[in-house]
From Swiss-Prot:
It comes from the Eukaryota. This is Conotoxin Cal6.37. Keywords: Disulfide bond, Knottin, Neurotoxin, Secreted, Signal, Toxin. Residues 1-22 form the signal peptide. Probable neurotoxin. It comes from Californiconus californicus. Its main location: secreted. GO terms for molecular function: toxin activity. It is found in: Secreted. Expressed by the venom duct. The cysteine framework is VI/VII (C-C-CC-C-C). Disulfide bonds join C32-C50, C40-C54, C49-C60. One of its GO terms (cellular component) is extracellular region.
Length: 63
């Protein structure tokens, strides 16, 4: 029982670390350059917003 709980916690921690690391790497590589609330009208919406998505070409909206 304890081993199962430890394994579940380990998987959850690895998943969270993977998400955080991928976001940090994305910013370091300059794949994203717009923060939430920034206008994305003149930018390609794919990958331009660091957090969230480009909402109808108007602004970056966090998820």
């Amino acid at each position: 029982m304890k081993l199962t709980c430890v394994m579940i916690v380990a998987v959850l921690l690895l998943t969270v670390c993977k998400v955080v690391t991928s976001d940090q790497l994305k910013k370091l590589r300059r794949e994203c350059y717009l923060e939430p609330g920034d206008s994305c009208f003149h930018h390609d919406g794919r990958g331009a917003c660091c957090e969230g998505t480009c909402f109808f070409g108007v602004a970056c909206v966090p998820w």
